[in-house]
Structures are given as structure tokens and as C-alpha cells.
Amino acid sequence: TFPSIELETAERVAREIGARHEIAQTDQLAIDDFVKNDANRCFHCKTDLYQLLTGLRESHAAAYVVDGTNLDDLGDDRPGLKAAREWGVRSPLVEAELSKTDIRNLAKELGLSNWDKPAAACLSSRIPRGNMITLETLHRVEDAEAVLHREGFRHFRVRNHGDVARIEVAKE
């Protein structure tokens, strides 16, 4: 449930590095445990994703499924990391002992357009735990964040609280 701008960034960076970009379609809203939005929401989402990617890995005769986990992610409570372990997903950035700062510096050295891109989080993370995740709510959050992006803000989140939106903007 990432904003569409993330897909645009992925497509652009794939072109920059000469990688084939393939989109794997998922439907988290079809997963009842995900929609309930409990403390294991990320686990349910990632389990579904890694199951799909494992099938793609096998059909492409690839050796591994990898993710973008880095050293800075390891201290956080991340149910998605548990799913990654269960599915045998490799984390090459962790294996290389790279932090977010290291990754940004390397991306800048390589001339990648996303080297200074703010961290992105799933739109579902903007909905308080226990509140059901719906397509309508996700669209509302994405639309509100798109307005902030068009206005030139870079580091922000819009959190959905029913009929109220809480806008968090970093000092820039």
C-alpha cells in the first residue's frame, strides 16, 4: 500500500542502473488479518508478498529473494522482519553492514536520482492500529500527501484519524 510516487521512483532508478523492472501485483486488502490492522499488520502483508516473490524467484530461476532492510532497521519492532526470516529472504544491505547514511552516500556517489529521497513508509502505517484499513482511507491519505509533495514539502506524513487528518511536517 505504497503511494504511486514510489512506483515512479522505482521505475526511474531501475532505468538509471539498467535493471529490468517487473511489477508483482499484490492485494493486501484481500487479507483479512491485514485489514484488521493489528500489531502484526506488517507480518501479514510481508508474508503475502514473500510468498508471491518466492514463486517469482522460482519461475525466474533466481537464487534469492532480497529486501532493502539496513542496519538502522534492526533495532525497531518490525513484524515484517519476522516474515522475511520465515521466508528465507536475504538482506544484502545488512550483510554488508550498511546504514541508511551509508546507503545515501553510496547512491550519491553513483549519481542515483533518489540518493536524498526521504524515507517512505506504507500508507497503512498512517492509520491507527485497530482501525480497519480501507481503499477509501488509503486514497485519502495518499491524496493529502500528494498535495504536500506538490507544495514542495519533502519530509511529512498525513495520519488518518477518521474525519481528522493529522499532518506532520519536519522542519526543513
Model-found features: residue ranges?
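Proteins with a high burden of low-complexity, intrinsically disordered sequence enriched in S/T/G/P/A and R
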Residues: 1, 85, 156, 171-172
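ATP-dependent adenylation/nucleotidyltransferase module used to activate substrates
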Residues: 1-109, 150, 165
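A short, flexible beta-alpha/helix-coil linker loop
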Residues: 29, 128-130, 172
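Mid-to-C-terminal catalytic subdomains of enzymes
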Residues: 97-148, 152-162
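Short, aliphatic-rich beta-strand segments
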Residues: 160-171
